[in-house]
């Protein structure tokens, strides 16, 4: 059931993140967001506080490979610097989608949602709880485990696992 109605424009949701790399937790949120929106824009954010392992283009290709069968419904874009809520408006999005893993995520996300609401009332924030089996993983943790030779095979897609191996064990 999407938020699209017969007489309205297709519904668009923006799911932002650094996705460095994309994990099965991210994929779960994107797949569930597709049940709510006609189109999900996966917005690769540039975060000046984070030093990414993968370039923006590498992350874009990584994500697109995960969703080859959903081409057209999932659009991957690298977001230039600026306010995410403004990007959402430019894309015609009705909502910003955020995944929550724990209560500690909610505090920060709640502040962001309120600020975005103050800036642009027409864009909603939608929170999706990460599936229980992915609740403990993060991109940072995945990179750390991979760098130190741990098994991440059930936490990321195979092509992402290979790319991490290439980065850490060329």
Curated annotation (Swiss-Prot):
Cellular localisation: Cytoplasm
Pfam families per UniProt: CTP_transf_like
GO biological process, one term: coenzyme A biosynthetic process
Entry GO terms, CC: cytoplasm
Organism: Desulfotalea psychrophila (strain LSv54 / DSM 12343)
NCBIfam families: coaD_prev_kdtB, cyt_tran_rel
Originating gene: coaD
EC number: 2.7.7.3
The protein's name: Phosphopantetheine adenylyltransferase
